[in-house]
Amino acid sequence: MGLYYCLREPPILTVIMGAKCVDGIVLVTDKKMTAEDGTFTYCDKIFGDLSHIIMGYTGWERTFDIFRKYIVGDLVINRDSKDRYTFSNYIPVASKSVKRFDKLVVDKCKHKFEVLIAKHQYEKSELHYINVDGTAIPIPYKAIGSGQNTADMHCGKLDHKNITMKYFVKRAYYSILYMDKFYPDLGVGIEDDDHPCIRYLENDKDLDREAPKDDKIECREYAINKLKEWNEKESDFLKD
């Protein structure tokens, strides 16, 4: 059947948000993956295949999986080469890989492939966005995927360098629930008894970690209350 046939109708990754905050870098994603026939599944969309490097992608699920294997394969093949991956050169080398990968696979697809990469090195941690041209851009905040515009509405104008990761997660959590409720066509969402995928890269920690359960519960309560406030305002507006 060939590679491009197998990529024809896989689920689409929907929204990924990243921010560099006062206490570290945080990545937040929904877990819903919607196929073109309307069916959907739930899974994590943030991966750390390499030490101190966390990635989130948008595009097709199978493209996403192939790219992960492509990066790891690149790492193995070039381990003795002058062009091998190191922690210091990871971003520019990964950018070249994204560009090559786009030419090999993504040019044949109708959904663009973008990457958010967080490099964890204490206070010097970096957040980068790699676009479809393979250009790496250092950023304080970025949302990618079908939910980008709505995420920007809720999270884009925050003073990221002066807020905590947990506060950013509260806003991102609210944005995900908002999209799930009011804009289902975006394909953004989580299961009723679950939380978004949340990874902390803290300034005072050596390793990244999943957000603690207590943080997730607190952020969920914030998001639900914000939705209630929005519903009440909308109801009052309609009454007028």
Q: Model features per residue range: what roles?
A:
Residues K119-G145:
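A mid-sequence, solvent-exposed acidic-amphipathic segment
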Residues V105-L127:
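Long, highly charged, low-complexity intrinsically disordered interaction regions
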